[in-house]
Amino acid sequence: MIYFNSDYLEGAHPSVMARLNETNMVQTVGYGEDEYCAAAREKIRAVCQAPEADVHFLVGGTQTNTTVIASILRPWQGVLSADSGHINCHEAGAIESTGHKVITLPAAEGKITAQQVQDYVEWHRNDESTEHIVQPSMVYISHPTEGGTLYSKAELTALYDTCRKYGLPLFIDGARLGYGVMADGSELTIPEIARLCDVFYIGGTKVGALFGEAVVIMNPALKKDFRFIMKQRGGRMAKGRLLGIQFDALFTDDLYFKISRHADEMAYQIRDIFVSAGYPLLFDSPTNQQSPIMPDDELAELGKSFGYEYWERVDKTHSGVRFCASWATTQEHVDALRAAVQALRK
């Protein structure tokens, strides 16, 4: 069985594992105050071209989203998100568990626009019952989106300008950030992303680490006391050095970018396999996620040998599914998928 369900199905990149093993018996202080975390922070600041940034390491995406959002919002406030956004669809009410509403906007290709944010905020502020309605007080997006699509530089700039106009912090979920910035046609680099938001994170769990996300706080107003809420939300690991070591390895010799590009290149082959066989796609994704629409009977047959993620029902006999490439995807796996898809069409 070969699994393309997601990009976190293996352990960690061998370079990360080697560094963890090399440092295993070195004693350090706890809770991310060690020299490995310090080195990783400096490397991330350099990559972001943001020496003023605060960098914090957390374990996983849901924990990171919950901690960041809870640190920004007051009790009566909510976060604007695409209706397809991860915090709305795939986090089991984690944001709501902090007492904050996820306010959804209809997405197009997984994205929301500056105009949508402006329209909603204006409606809220001008409604006669405004004080009875959850106050939209920050904006959440992911890059790439849930379907693997990307914001253009113009789209993100407009969104950030609107957020600043209304005083709404913009938070970018970067769980798959590497796969986004290394994609064909990507208009945004990590330094540009850092300049066009208030806080974002660089995903490790899905991009070569065993676990871990690196939160980068750009807005000075959001920096104060963040480590307190990290602790309260279970985000400060006693063995925090394990996070620093991994990110230090990932940002040595451009490893993070090299393995992200590898995943995208594997994904382009996967896309071509399905397109050349006549299958349409749910999304025009330039990243590591590809989503063909297939007849259910063919999906069942393919599922005997390959894992994929069910996405949505398209009609009575067709479904959209997701095939993910990752830093660990091999050419042999892709070739096996190609042969199986071609066999379906014979």
What are these regions (language model features)?
Residues 71-89:
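Conserved PLP-anchoring active-site segment centered on the Schiff-base-forming lysine
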Residues 13-61, 83-88, 94:
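Conserved N-terminal alpha-helix of the aminotransferase class I/II PLP-enzyme fold
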Residues 79, 102-103, 170-172, 281, ...:
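Hydrophobic beta-strand scaffold residues
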Residues 74-76, 268-343:
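Conserved C-terminal alpha-helix-loop-beta "cap" of PLP-dependent enzymes
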Residues 151-183:
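Catalytic PLP-binding core of fold-type I/II PLP enzymes
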Residues 108-109, 135-136, 142, 150, ...:
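Active-site C-terminal subdomain of aminotransferase-like
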Residues 99-137, 141-144, 150-158:
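PLP-dependent aminotransferase-class I/II
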